[in-house]
């Protein structure tokens, strides 16, 4: 009704105002209502057992992705009418929310590598992550890339040298990882010792050591004992030169090595010595030489190769380059502004030391860094006010980047700690594997020796002795099979060899002791797999039947249970674990135990005379179950 009214109402209104005449024909059919979403358009996504439901139109908003394209049909299961994905359901929640809201977020508690794998699987690019999470995502990804690179470098300079490595690669590996060999470790400690000696000598040679004969003024130790310090400096420089040349020759890329920071430090540390050897005694040149000797202090940076803390500090400063640049730029702006203000504020004072704006730079730097030497102080009230503001602003400007630097240092430090821990765990794991292999080999050889000794003792007729030896893995599995069959079928199983011996000796059916096929039933042997009952004696059915009589032998798939009347119950089971018919009466008053013959395939044994061992006789009886060991 409402639909019909809605159809002709526009025509009636138009005719009333004279826009168009009333239609003479029949009214048009009412417009069809938009088909509502039915259950057919509801898609069920099963992600590792977790069910997600969403509309098909929601997924088809992004046809370039896996869920939005027809490729998702490859994961459809008609039986369950679900799309099954063997992926992480926790990360999939965020991916499905992207289809719903159009905003992709990064879960901070998830692994960055697993998150990237899920995005790649479902066809999403990381660039669509929202602005609220993108910066943290990039930081985590950069940290993970650095960690993987460190692990790769560690693996390349691992503990074990590859047999295909050249001499050049071995030398470079020894420099980068001194713990790979004894010679590399010795050279590592020798260079560290000479670095310390060089730095100490550079400091001690400036200490006054008294006046020499003919001089009133005290001379420094470097001038009074010039020969000793020169020899010491020569020895240190020779060691540093040899190290630098070896590193240059063994470097994978000499161009990159020469441009590296540590290479420049090495050159600056040894260059003043060689310049001093070729310089003349001219006073002007001597003054320049004194200036060059200042660069010897850079030898202390060579300790960075020997100190993990210094390397972490260098990595921190490198990773905080943007923050340090912002700090330097902010300080420069503040220094220029406050130096200009202080100069004009103190310009009217006659005793003011702020003679120019560059002269006020010193006061501004000292004040903003909260040092306050007191050599330059403002005299006017305006100067004191602006000086206080300068001091407070310096605290704020310097304190802002400090937490970022500290967090980066902590992050890099913990990364190195985890890397060291992983290397230690890997080393311990390899040591355990080597020990296990060595122990297994020793145990195997010992078992072989025990087996040979046992065979020799058993073959000796003069000194018969019983020597217990542990069975092979095949025998262990065989006895375990017997134990499981006994527990499953309530039948007693006997080896075929034992059964043959018992049938051949009819008079000794009730033997005082028998060789049980189980490891645990052997005297002096303790089973580690399963414990079977040790039978002092067992009853063998149809023991009085001659061995030449050929009887019927049952297969394991058919097990007959007999009672006192010996009435066979025709019941077969294709599996030992299958349930039997309820009509089968298992608990008889006097059960008759079915005996099984366990056949272990053994190679034919040749007697000393050269004849082969005769075949095993066939045995009759309907109560015999033959079980093949294979």
Curated annotation (Swiss-Prot):
- State its location(s): Cell membrane; Cell projection, Dendrite; Synapse; Perikaryon
Q: Could you give one GO CC term from the UniProt record?
A: Kv4.2-KChIP2 channel complex
* Phenotype for residue 74 to R: Abolishes interaction with KCNIP1
Biological source species: Rattus norvegicus
- Modified positions (Phosphoserine) are 438, 548, 552, 572, 575, 616
Enumerate the Pfam families for this protein. BTB_2, DUF3399, Ion_trans, Shal-type
Residue numbers bearing the Phosphothreonine modification: 38, 602, 607
Note the Gene3D superfamilies from the entry. 1.10.287.70, Potassium Channel Kv1.1, Chain A, Voltage-gated potassium channels. Chain C
Predominant localisation class: membrane
Relate the outcome reported for changing residue 79 to L/R: Abolishes interaction with KCNIP1
Q: In which tissues is it expressed?
A: Detected in brain cortex, hippocampus, dentate gyrus, thalamus and cerebellum. Detected in neurons from the primary visual cortex. Detected in the supraoptic nucleus in hypothalamus, in hippocampus and the habenular nucleus of the thalamus. Detected in the bed nucleus of the stria terminalis. Detected in dendritic fields in the hippocampus CA1 layer, in stratum radiatum, stratum oriens, stratum lacunosum-moleculare and stratum pyramidale. Detected in dendritic fields in the hippocampus CA3 layer and in dentate gyrus.
Q: What's noted about domains in the record?
A: The transmembrane segment S4 functions as a voltage-sensor and is characterized by a series of positively charged amino acids at every third position. Channel opening and closing is effected by a conformation change that affects the position and orientation of the voltage-sensor paddle formed by S3 and S4 within the membrane. A transmembrane electric field that is positive inside would push the positively charged S4 segment outwards, thereby opening the pore, while a field that is negative inside would pull the S4 segment inwards and close the pore.
Q: Per its record, how is this protein called by name?
A: A-type voltage-gated potassium channel KCND2
InterPro entries (alphabetical): BTB/POZ_dom (IPR000210), Ion_trans_dom (IPR005821), K_chnl_volt-dep_Kv (IPR003968), K_chnl_volt-dep_Kv4 (IPR003975), K_chnl_volt-dep_Kv4.2 (IPR004055), K_chnl_volt-dep_Kv4_C (IPR024587), Shal-type_N (IPR021645), SKP1/BTB/POZ_sf (IPR011333)
Which one GO biological process term can you cite for this protein? muscle contraction
Q: What molecular function does GO assign, one term?
A: monoatomic ion channel activity
């Amino acid at each position: 009704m409402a639909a019909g009214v809605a159809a002709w109402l526009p025509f009636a209104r138009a005719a009333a105002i004279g826009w168009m005449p009333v239609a003479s024909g029949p009214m048009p059919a009412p417009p069809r209502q938009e088909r509502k979403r039915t259950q057919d358009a509801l898609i069920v996504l099963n992600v590792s057992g977790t069910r997600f439901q969403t509309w098909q139109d929601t997924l088809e908003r992004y046809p370039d992705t896996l869920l939005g394209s027809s490729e998702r049909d490859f994961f459809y299961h008609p039986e369950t009418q679900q799309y099954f994905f063997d992926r992480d359901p926790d990360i999939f929640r965020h991916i499905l929310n992207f289809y719903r809201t159009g905003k992709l977020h990064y879960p901070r508690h998830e692994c960055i590598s697993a998150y990237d794998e899920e995005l790649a699987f479902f066809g999403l690019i990381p660039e669509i992550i929202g602005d609220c999470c993108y910066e943290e995502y990039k930081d985590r990804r950069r940290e993970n890339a650095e960690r993987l690179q460190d692990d790769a470098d560690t693996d390349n300079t691992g503990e074990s040298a590859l047999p295909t490595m050249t001499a050049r690669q071995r030398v470079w590996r020894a420099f980068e990882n001194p713990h790979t060999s004894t010679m590399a470790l010795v050279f590592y400690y020798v260079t560290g010792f000479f670095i310390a000696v060089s730095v100490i000598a550079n400091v001690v040679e400036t200490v006054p050591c008294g006046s020499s004969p003919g001089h009133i003024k005290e001379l420094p130790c470097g001038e009074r004992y010039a020969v000793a310090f020169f020899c010491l400096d020569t020895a240190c420089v020779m060691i540093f030169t040899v190290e630098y040349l070896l590193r240059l020759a063994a470097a994978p890329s000499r161009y990159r090595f020469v441009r590296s920071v540590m290479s420049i430090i090495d050159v600056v540390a040894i260059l003043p010595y060689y310049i001093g050897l070729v310089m003349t005694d001219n006073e002007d040149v001597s003054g320049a030489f004194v200036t060059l000797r200042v660069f010897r202090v850079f030898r202390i940076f060579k300790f960075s190769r020997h100190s993990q803390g210094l390397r972490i500090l260098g990595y921190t400063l490198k990773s905080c380059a943007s923050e340090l640049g912002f700090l330097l730029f902010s300080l420069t702006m503040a220094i220029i502004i406050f130096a200009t203000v202080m100069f004009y504020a103190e310009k009217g004072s006659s005793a003011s030391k702020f003679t120019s704006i560059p002269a006020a730079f010193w006061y501004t730097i000292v004040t903003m860094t909260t040092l306050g030497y007191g050599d330059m102080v403002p005299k006017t009230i305006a100067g004191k006010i602006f000086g206080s503001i300068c001091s407070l602003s310096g605290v704020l400007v310097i304190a802002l980047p400090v937490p970022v630097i500290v967090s980066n240092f902590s992050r890099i430090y913990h990364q190195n700690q985890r890397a060291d821990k992983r290397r230690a765990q890997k080393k311990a794991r390899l040591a355990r594997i080597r020990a296990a292999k060595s122990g297994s080999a020793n145990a195997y050889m010992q078992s072989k020796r025990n087996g040979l000794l046992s065979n020799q003792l058993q073959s000796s007729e003069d000194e018969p002795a019983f020597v217990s030896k542990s069975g092979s893995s095949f025998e262990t599995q065989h006895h375990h099979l017997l134990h499981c069959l006994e527990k499953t079928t309530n039948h007693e199983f006997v080896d075929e060899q034992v059964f043959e011996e018992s049938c051949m000796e009819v008079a000794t059916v009730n033997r005082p002791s028998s060789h049980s096929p189980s490891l645990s039933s052997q005297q002096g042997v303790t089973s580690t797999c399963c414990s079977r009952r040790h039978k002092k004696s067992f009853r063998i059915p149809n023991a009085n039947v001659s061995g030449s009589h050929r009887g019927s032998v049952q297969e394991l798939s058919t097990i007959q249970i007999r009672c006192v009347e010996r009435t066979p119950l025709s019941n077969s089971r294709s599996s030992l674990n299958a349930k039997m018919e309820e009509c089968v009466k298992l608990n008889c008053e006097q059960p008759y135990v079915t005996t099984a013959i366990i056949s272990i395939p053994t190679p034919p044994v040749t007697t000393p005379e050269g004849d082969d061992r005769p075949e095993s006789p066939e045995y009759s009886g309907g109560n015999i179950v033959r079980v093949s060991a294979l």
